[in-house]
């Protein structure tokens, strides 16, 4: 069930704000509940709702406190480099929908299958989400671990993700659950070097991650990242930005994701990077 459209995250590689808008357009609670009520009439309905979501599932109902300021604002992101003070971060409408959906007699369980912004979360919402609406795996998108690369991506610092990781583990432990975080990562984003990818592999190994939800950067129209990819310049600072463009360079960066496979192919792709991952004595 798509609850809203639009995204104010402003990630430099993403086009959602271009084709859905930066302002969140949310469906009414009544509209959402009417759609869910009709599901019980489907012959294949089993009582499990796979996704109460949107582009970023936890942005439902959010908007500027003073919309006249939003109309004048030229910031590409309401979350980066810091969350805008004018952003209304009210989770009450979203939590209300979760509770009403779960109270419906034909709903056995409702999940959030869409990705969430872990840098936009209250403790109350986080606990509700993790204990009641995760089907075993929760999708999040740190995208990288390098401070400089994350700045170019307009994503929160890696430390913000680590804090959420600890919160996720704590809530699971307290609730007696064994659920997983599924982090999304990107290689070869403008500004990303082999050294940055080595750091990413080391952080993933430290957290016992085996990255699978990964992709190599693909330039898409109307994004800052694509501008940097083709020009090699950050247009905001006019500074040079390293760009991995050749197949060899891109394959090498992508190979760092698969340090855990230890295959000859994955090792060769990253130039024997497994030997460089800290704590890996087997080489």
Regions of interest found by a model, annotated:
Residues 195, 205-212, 216-278:
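C-terminal accessory regions of radical SAM enzymes
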């Amino acid at each position: 069930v798509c609850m809203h459209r639009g995204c104010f995250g402003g990630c430099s590689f993403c086009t959602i704000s271009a084709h859905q808008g930066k302002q969140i357009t949310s469906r009414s609670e009544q509209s959402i509940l009417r759609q869910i009520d009709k599901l019980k009439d489907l012959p294949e309905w089993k009582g499990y709702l796979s996704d109460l979501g949107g582009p970023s599932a936890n942005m439902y109902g959010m908007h500027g406190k003073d919309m006249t300021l939003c109309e004048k604002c030229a910031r590409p992101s309401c979350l980066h480099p810091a969350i805008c003070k004018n952003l209304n971060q009210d989770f009450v409408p979203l939590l209300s929908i979760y509770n009403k959906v779960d109270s419906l007699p034909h709903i056995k369980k409702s999940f959030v299958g869409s990705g969430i912004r872990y840098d936009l979360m209250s403790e109350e919402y986080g606990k509700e989400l993790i204990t009641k609406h995760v089907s075993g795996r929760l999708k999040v998108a740190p995208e990288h671990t390098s401070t400089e690369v994350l700045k170019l991506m307009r994503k929160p610092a890696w430390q913000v993700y680590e804090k959420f990781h600890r919160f996720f583990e704590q809530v699971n432990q307290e609730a007696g659950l064994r659920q997983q975080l599924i982090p999304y990562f990107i290689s070869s984003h403008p500004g990303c070097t082999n050294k940055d990818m080595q750091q990413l592999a080391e952080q993933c190994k430290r957290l016992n991650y085996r990255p699978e939800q990964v992709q190599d950067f693909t330039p898409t129209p109307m994004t800052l990242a694509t501008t940097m990819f083709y020009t090699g310049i950050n247009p905001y600072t006019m500074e040079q930005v390293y760009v991995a463009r050749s197949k060899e360079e891109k394959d090498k960066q992508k190979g760092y994701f698969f340090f855990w496979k230890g295959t000859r192919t994955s090792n060769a792709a990253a130039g024997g990077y497994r030997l460089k991952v800290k704590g890996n004595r087997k080489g």
